[in-house]
Amino acid sequence: MVSHKPSKQRLLLYNLPKHQRHKLLTAKLSKELQQQYGIKRLAIRKGDTVKVMRGDKDVLNFEGKVVEVNRKTGRIAIEGLTRKKADGTPVYRWIHASKVIITKLDLSDAKRKEIIERKRKAREEYLKKKEQTTEAK
């Protein structure tokens, strides 16, 4: 971000185009998935299983499948995580994407497999360069 003013940073965040906002909807992978795929973060998609790591006691450690992703607000709806309205109808409790970890990936899309592979290769190259620079010193 260019400015240090919080108000300007919020303004830029709220007015981001959807293709850039999608990059903000990422979450850490669980330790097992990090070891399996060799990456640390990935964009959340509908169908992923996530675990809530921050929030109220009734939300904390809740695990469920992502039902909906809202790019406008940067929040996700998780299956089974609902509250009741005054008339008794259940509605989803929206959780910010940064407050969850991904425990199981939905790999039904071949494009997502390509994304994971591309990110893994980029991370390996980064680690090699980092290792070479530390050896040179």
UniProtKB/Swiss-Prot annotation:
Residues in coiled coil: none
Q: Name one GO molecular function term.
A: structural constituent of ribosome
What's the subunit arrangement here? Part of the 50S ribosomal subunit.
Print the keywords alphabetically.
Ribonucleoprotein, Ribosomal protein, RNA-binding, rRNA-binding
UniProt lists the family membership as follows: Belongs to the universal ribosomal protein uL24 family.
The leader peptide range reads none
Identify the NCBIfam families for this entry: rplX_A_E
Please give the function described in this protein's UniProt entry: One of two assembly initiator proteins, it binds directly to the 5'-end of the 23S rRNA, where it nucleates assembly of the 50S subunit. Located at the polypeptide exit tunnel on the outside of the subunit.
A biological-process GO annotation:
translation
- For this entry, the protein name equals Large ribosomal subunit protein uL24
**Which GO terms of the cellular component aspect does the record hold?**
large ribosomal subunit
